[in-house]
Amino acid sequence: MFKIYNIKSRIIRENMNNKLFDKTIEHVIKYLNENIFFEKYTRISGLLQNIESRIKIISLVIFLVGSVLSKHILTLIIFNSIALILAYLSNIPLLQYLKRVYVFIPIFAGIIAIPVMFNFMTPGKDVFVILNNPHISITYEGLIYAITFTLRVATCVSFAVLIPITTQWNKVTSAIHKLGVPEVVITITNLAYRYIFLLLNFVLDMMYSRKSRVVNKLGMVESWKEAGKAIGALFIKTYQMGEDXYYAMLSRGYNGEIKHIYREEIKIKDIAFLLFSIIITALLVLFDRGIL
């Protein structure tokens, strides 16, 4: 195993000329490392780790819904601060947590919101004039809307991420089963979660194999052809893996229902945390609407 790893490492060092390939490899490896990294925080002692799983999911969803209902930047900042405080009290390194929350999805949301800032999408007071004839500018109303939208997405992600970081996956599936989520949804989600790692390793193996057999840099058309072949091979492998997994489950007595073992009990501290989330969310939403 170590010999194969050393060969792969040597191939990467000698042939890392294609920047797109480099970035793809790096992204996949980081994805795997981040998931392994966050898994260990489900087993440490912290605020959210000690909350019963059903209560935790319901409470974080309540915070998330409150963030969606909020329309003002100040309210969203307060919700975001609550998420950071919960992460800190759960002994999660804030730097890693912020990277997880803000690196991709909020940036993507901000890019989507860019057109809304212009006067032809959101008329209003000009903040920055780009062209006079035709008149194209960034308006104050559009800028506020874009910031609010991006911050709302970031806040929702910050609460959603806390669930898998602080809860073991088997407890998540058992908890949502207790909450009445259909068994089919749980089964599909469970299989997807468990086999995504195998598929990512298969993608890595394909990339290593392709790189070890390429001498010269491929042109754009050749790269597209190779990418198409890789996607086709991945699809076939995924289909075969799904069939094998299904027949293996049938051979072991699977009848469409998975047995869930749930041993957690609701305690006073769990009820207190649920009441805290309800009261804080209600107060912030009322404050956002100008009622308080």
From Swiss-Prot:
Broad class of where this protein is predominantly found: membrane
Subcellular localization(s) per the UniProt record: Cell membrane
GO cellular component, one term: ATP-binding cassette (ABC) transporter complex
Origin superkingdom: Archaea
Bilayer-crossing regions: 57-77, 101-121, 143-163, 184-204, 271-291
Key words, A-Z: Cell membrane, Membrane, Transmembrane, Transmembrane helix
Biological-process GO terms, alphabetical: cobalt ion transport
Disulphide bridges, residue numbers: none
Membrane disposition: Multi-pass membrane protein
Family label: Belongs to the CbiQ family.
Record protein name field: Uncharacterized protein MJ1571
Lineage of producing organism: Archaea, Methanobacteriati, Methanobacteriota, Methanomada group, Methanococci
